[in-house]
Amino acid sequence: MSHQETYRHNEAYAQFLAGWDAAFYAKYADTLKPNEPGARALDVGCGVGQVVARLAEAGFEAHGVDVSEPNIERAKKFCPRCQLYDGRRLPFPDAHFASVGALNVLEHVDEPEAFIKELVRVTRLGGRIVVSSPNFFRVFGFRDYHPRMRGVANKWRNWRRLQAKRRQMRESPESVRFDKMTPIVKEPFTPDDDAIVATNALEMRFFLERNGCTVERVECTDRYVAKPIDFALNLLPTRYMMFNAFLVATRKV
């Protein structure tokens, strides 16, 4: 059974997602809004539908897909254009959407490289792609809620891994793959215990660019914060080593 299949009938996870505060997904949802009124937008891994609902309320033709039946059952109450999918091939034709995004999904998928390729495939030329995930290669920061992020030893290991990834991208780009992790099984559940991919901004950018995108923004802040703080955090390349990985790209024409 694939890791994604564990979410198929997970009612408890649907209840967990239903408790998200709107501030958690506001930046992602606002960035996902297409530039043209009424344009089509897709939220991949839509959960219980909060982002889809926000887009629909703003006048866009919002769609959502998820691998979880309990999630989709709830999401359809927000928007009937939410549907179950297999977690691999998106059930839409090529170049179908003005904007496509995935919030905290990439770290949970079995084939992250193929997942990014699918996001790009269903985005029209000139369209927007928004991908946001935890940065498991943190070197700086706080609120290190996952063991991969904690402690000086892990942060040093993350620094060295980032340097190795950079060399690999230069010398053998066709061999680059996201690192995999073993999910953590414990009670109580904490966010991303179930993550199986060591997502990070460096590789997310790499695979977006390899699939024909221009990356417009790489930020370590996945939520709205005060503008001076946001500017300072995202000014330097250290943003690749902090907090989260929030990327905005355009599919090349």
PLM segments and residue spans:
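Short catalytic micro-motifs in class I SAM-dependent methyltransferases
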Residues: 104-108
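Helix-loop segment at the mouth of the active site in Rossmann-fold oxidoreductases
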Residues: 90-92, 109
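C-terminal beta-strand of the catalytic ATP-binding
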Residues: 250-253
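S-adenosyl-L-methionine-dependent methyltransferase catalytic module, highlighting the catalytic core
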Residues: 50, 110-118, 128-248
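Conserved N-terminal segment of class I S-adenosyl-L-methionine
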Residues: 1-90, 99-103, 116, 197, ...
